[in-house]
Design a protein with these regions (language model features):
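P-loop/Walker A NTP-binding region and its immediately flanking N-terminal helices
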Residues: 1-171
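Extended, largely alpha-helical regulatory/partner-binding modules appended to the mid-to-C-terminal parts
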Residues: 23, 59, 73-76, 80-87, ...
């Protein structure tokens, strides 16, 4: 089955993450110096790497054969997190699991130690979608978190997250990725995929993506589905210009 480019080329290490050097450096230093916190909040526009960094971090703190601060990607824990068979790393979409009962179930789970990992990691995406009661339940866990639990909250709307939650998290602001960084990544991916992408086309896609790497790769995917020779005219045609 064909895998979309944004999924196939999702960064697997901190080194692969484009345009967020300050954040990846800080996270790597915490791992290397064993100063991992119990709660983080990643905020920024869509497609800037929040969930990707959360997953890399979750693997890195639990990896059995870590390469510096990066996960090896090959050990049973890394592969198990990738394929969903390791239950100690849980990704929750708050948009569809936003009730107090969902968070109470999570709270009950945190009482148990990890089965195969060092840490249980809960990645709560679009956390701003939680109900007021759910936020209150989450706060109760975060006030006295078990030592084996890490929360990584991700949001595109930080202003909707209660101050009581924010004050208990390390905050990292993901910025829109610079067009030149997106352009470079597009040209690299195109080369690996044997797609003939012109620099002008890469630059145009980078501008259309408005700082979101995921969107840029999706546009490239759409264009390459029409022709393997992607120039600026192809991009304009597919973008409806």
């Amino acid at each position: 089955m064909y895998r979309a480019l944004y999924r196939k080329w999702r960064p697997a290490t901190f080194e692969d993450v484009v345009g967020q050097a300050g954040i990846t450096t800080a996270l790597k230093n915490q791992i290397l110096h064993d100063k991992v916190g119990h709660a983080y909040i990643f905020t920024g526009t869509r497609g800037t790497g929040k969930t990707t960094c959360a997953k890399i971090f979750a693997k890195a703190v639990n990896c059995q054969s870590r390469n510096g601060a990066d996960p090896c990607g090959q050990c049973p824990v890394c592969t198990g997190i990738d394929d969903g068979s390791v239950m100690d790393v849980v990704e929750i979409d708050a948009a569809s699991n936003n009730g107090v009962d969902n968070i109470r179930d999570l709270r009950d789970e945190t009482a148990y130690t990890p089965s195969v990992c060092t840490y249980k990691v809960y990645i709560i995406d679009e956390v701003h979608m939680l109900s007021t009661a759910a936020f209150n339940a989450l706060l109760k866990i975060m006030e006295e978190p078990p030592s084996h639990v890490i929360f990584i909250l991700a949001t595109t709307e930080i202003h909707k997250v209660p101050a009581t939650i924010l004050s208990r998290c390390q905050r990292y602001d993901f910025t829109r990725i610079a067009p030149q960084d997106i352009e470079g990544r597009l040209l690299y991916v195109a080369g690996q995929e044997k797609i003939e992408l012109t620099p002008d086309a890469a630059g145009l896609i980078a501008r259309l993506a408005d700082g979101a790497m995921r969107d840029a790769l999706s546009i490239l995917d759409t264009c390459a589905g029409v022709t393997n020779q992607v120039d600026a005219d192809v991009v304009r045609r597919m973008a409806g210009d």
